From Swiss-Prot:
SUPFAM superfamilies: Trm112p-like (SSF158997)
Protein name: UPF0434 protein Vapar_2640
Taxonomic source organism: Variovorax paradoxus (strain S110)
InterPro entries in the record: Trm112-like
Protein family: Belongs to the UPF0434 family.
Length: 60
């Protein structure tokens, strides 16, 4: 994930920052508890395409 692009992108639900998970190819929003997929290098920032992050994934 391009770091400059990551600095510009925000969670569409909370408008908060996103973190890159290279292992799962996802952009994660801790505040929304959502992980957005990245397909072919393109972030899919649609709430209905995101999966819910577990407490374990959030480190809770």
């Amino acid at each position: 994930m391009d770091t400059k692009l990551l600095e510009l992108l925000v969670c569409p639900v909370t408008k908060g920052p996103l973190t890159w998970n290279p292992e799962k190819q996802e952009l994660c929003s801790r505040s929304a508890r959502l992980a957005y997929p990245v397909r072919d290098g393109i972030p899919v920032l649609l709430e209905n395409e995101a999966r819910t992050l577990s407490d374990e994934e959030l480190g809770l």
